[in-house]
Amino acid sequence: GVASGPVSFMKIFDAATEQIKQGGRRRGANMGILDATHPDILEFVDAKRDPETLRNFNLSVATDETFWTAYRSGNPFDLLNPRTDEVVATVDPDDLLDHIAEMAWETGDPGMLFLDRINEDNPTPSLGRIEATNPCGEVPLLPYEACVLGSINLGHHTDGDEIDWDALRETVHLSVRFLDNTVTMSTFPIPAIETQVQRTRKIGLGVMGFHDLLVDLAIPYTADAAIDVADELMAFIREESVAASRGLAAERGPFPAFEDSTVEVPIRNAVTTSIAPTGTISMIADCSASIEPIYNVAYTKRVLGGLEMVNDRFIDIAKDRGFYSEALLETVHGRTSIQDVDAVPDDVKRLFLTAHDVPPERHLRIQAAFQQHVDNAVSKTVNLPRSADVGAVRDIFLRARELDLKGVTVFRSGARPEQVLGEDPLKEECISECEYVGPEPG
């Protein structure tokens, strides 16, 4: 017989996930990753053209320098039998990239992963090559590894109009200890997962509330100063997380695979940092998600039953400055930009740029500023308006490669009817049962 290929088996996993919902309501999430060299790559790229297919999957195409060399040179790109490495077909890499961009434009999937960049930071190559990530792409994983994540609310780490570095240092050290304890105390569904997790003790400490922090510092998200803050901030968190993990190694011992790793100084956790999307926990913490710009000032979060969200910082500034009114709140509700709202002063508008006000280049440069100090990866979405064309998506993939990112996701507004944050919730009728299950690798 002939195997039916990866896409057919993904549909089986998707159906199983649909039946096993979290608490009977919230869907689980899967990440489907296929190497660009796979003979079924075109079928994979097209897999979510039907919006009812693979609703519990994010998709990403895995590439490395082999693909990008072929793309730059214009040479044919080989598709290989994954068992024998035999060339079974060739494609035009330019056409393949166009097709990936077209489907990402249409559906939000697939994203793009850069596996060579990911494996540059693999601390345990003796245990294998990393070929996959967790569902949102912020944790590259070896087979049977799991992600243990935590995120610091940056909005709680300011002193006036400055970052409170002492408070942040204390939070980082406590968080690393907490996450390491979590690795120890967690139970896993099968022994192989427990063995692999305990072997490397990987953790992913990240941030949320970055846009809130910028508002407190009076820095627009698109300003060069925002990139500087991202750079300095994540360098500090990285340095302190490593110091905390080394302290734990002295106290508890290094991770068991340390001797066979590329890490030179004993450390408790093979990796310590990661930027997760924080879609749910940022709601609980009442802060902006991850390192993303805000999506709206006031909007409906498209979860089961709907949830009204209002930016407290915007309300506080409006009241302090004397331009708050219920009519203003109604005006800004559900808008993807407040830049044309006359009642809002220009300097305030600049602080509350939304995801659609931020040009793709600025999305990517913020991601790059964080990524250079993150040993896992960064989950970030480059948002585009409905009017964006396929070429804009393609350009983002190319620029992400230039900026040395580990992955990138593009989402054009309206590409999926169940997106969590609707442009105009009053006009949207499709209510999702859970958060948007879309690709967010970074």
What are these regions (language model features)?
Residues 39-41, 49-50, 84-85, 110, ...:
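Short, glycine-/Ser/Thr-/acidic-enriched flexible segments
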